[in-house]
């Protein structure tokens, strides 16, 4: 018997998540002095000064002790920031862990998990790994205000008696598209209470469009809704791996039964507590991203590319031809972007909105790739 056959049926059907290139590994492989990393939607401004100070003050001798398993100080800080009950908060080793934990906790083999076509890759992986039947719902057409966005009518039609979990990212990664308040509210009313709706708001802090709802406001009206957020993006703490979910306390209590003990380390807890309280820093990050996102959009469009609307810290660009050669040529010039072939978008690349000089460097390299390397 092959070892793989010893795995559960869901795991046997599973492909590992592709996190993209490690910048240092690819730099050494290509023999380049440095790499410009614009493939993972990280925050070039980094964490706030208050977070940096908190981490400087931590004694490394603390590393011999287990962290607070309940992360009470951090949960209280998150609760205070969003006006929720601390018992409604579940912490994860990144929101990725929470998305998987929700499937592991609530889904049984034979249940259906509904998610949009071009939704975050982890949705499908979590569904398959839990032994569920993944129901991938066709997206909106490319022509329209929300190209390749989640189709609310199709998502509603996909709901059935076996639906146990619904995943939706707002704004969506990788398309950058979103549902407005009315669309999301109408959808939530139609979801039976026998199913849990997970709204992933990893990019919430970057939103500057007023019609994009804060899902926490809607979640308070629906006991079967869970909102996930992360400290990896706008808060600049990707390396510390920390995210959180907010739901009704009863649902959060069930998640506590399956959440790994000590899944959030001591340093991540301290940094995140400082980060969530620094509202001014997050606003500076949002404003800087909004400005640079439009600069980058204009530059990409000037190169003749179709650029999807976005409320995140990234842009999806369609090259109208296979994008893999473009990605490879950019790598040789020291620039990392994210290919979208795995999402069924082989003509597209997702590009993180960087700092001003990073965006200038990307546009210069891309122009040379299109007009020289691949001309």
Predicted regions span which residues?
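Conserved PLP-binding catalytic core of the aspartate aminotransferase-like
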Residues: 141, 290, 299-333, 349
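PLP-dependent enzyme catalytic core of the Aspartate aminotransferase-like
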Residues: 329-338, 342-375
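N-terminal small-domain helix-loop-helix segment of the aminotransferase-like
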Residues: 2-96, 101, 373-375
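Short acidic capping loops at alpha-helix termini that bridge into adjacent secondary structure
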Residues: 85-89, 109-112, 162, 194, ...
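PLP-dependent aminotransferase class I/II
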Residues: 70, 224-308
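Active-site pre-lysine segment of PLP-dependent enzymes
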Residues: 128, 145-161, 174-197, 201-234
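PLP-dependent aminotransferase-like
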Residues: 105-168
């Amino acid at each position: 018997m092959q070892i793989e056959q010893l795995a559960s049926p869901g795991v046997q059907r599973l492909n590992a998540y592709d996190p993209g290139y490690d910048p240092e590994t690819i730099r050494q492989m290509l023999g380049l002095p440095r790499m410009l990393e614009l493939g993972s939607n990280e925050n070039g401004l980094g964490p706030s000064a208050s977070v940096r100070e908190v981490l400087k003050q931590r004694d490394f001798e603390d590393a011999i002790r287990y962290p607070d398993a309940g992360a009470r100080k951090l949960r209280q800080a998150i609760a205070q920031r969003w006006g929720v009950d601390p018992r409604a908060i579940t912490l994860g080793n990144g929101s990725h862990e929470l998305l998987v934990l929700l499937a592991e906790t609530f889904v049984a083999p034979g249940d259906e998990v509904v998610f949009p076509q071009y939704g975050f890759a982890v949705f499908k992986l979590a569904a398959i790994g839990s032994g569920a039947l993944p129901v991938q719902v066709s997206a909106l057409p490319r022509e329209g205000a929300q190209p390749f966005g989640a189709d609310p009518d199709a998502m509603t039609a996909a709901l059935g008696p076996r639906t146990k979990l619904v995943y939706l990212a707002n704004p969506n990664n990788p398309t950058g598209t979103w549902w407005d308040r009315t669309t999301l509210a109408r959808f939530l009313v139609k979801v039976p209470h026998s199913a849990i709706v997970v709204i992933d708001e990893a990019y919430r802090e970057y939103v500057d469009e007023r019609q994009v709802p804060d899902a926490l406001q809607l979640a308070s009206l629906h006991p079967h809704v869970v909102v996930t957020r992360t400290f990896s993006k706008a808060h600049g703490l990707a390396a510390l791996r920390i995210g959180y979910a907010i739901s009704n306390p009863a649902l959060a209590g069930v998640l506590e039964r399956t959440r790994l003990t000590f899944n959030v380390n001591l340093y991540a807890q301290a940094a995140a507590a400082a980060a969530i309280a620094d509202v001014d820093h997050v606003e500076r990050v949002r404003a800087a991203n909004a400005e640079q996102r439009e600069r980058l959009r204009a530059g990409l469009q000037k190169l003749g590319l179709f650029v999807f609307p976005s409320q995140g810290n990234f842009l999806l660009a369609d090259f109208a031809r296979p994008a893999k050669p473009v990605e490879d040529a950019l790598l040789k010039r020291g620039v990392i972007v994210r290919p979208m072939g795995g999402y069924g978008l082989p003509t597209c690349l997702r590009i993180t909105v960087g700092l001003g000089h990073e965006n200038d460097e990307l546009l210069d390299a891309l122009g040379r790739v299109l007009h020289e390397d691949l001309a």
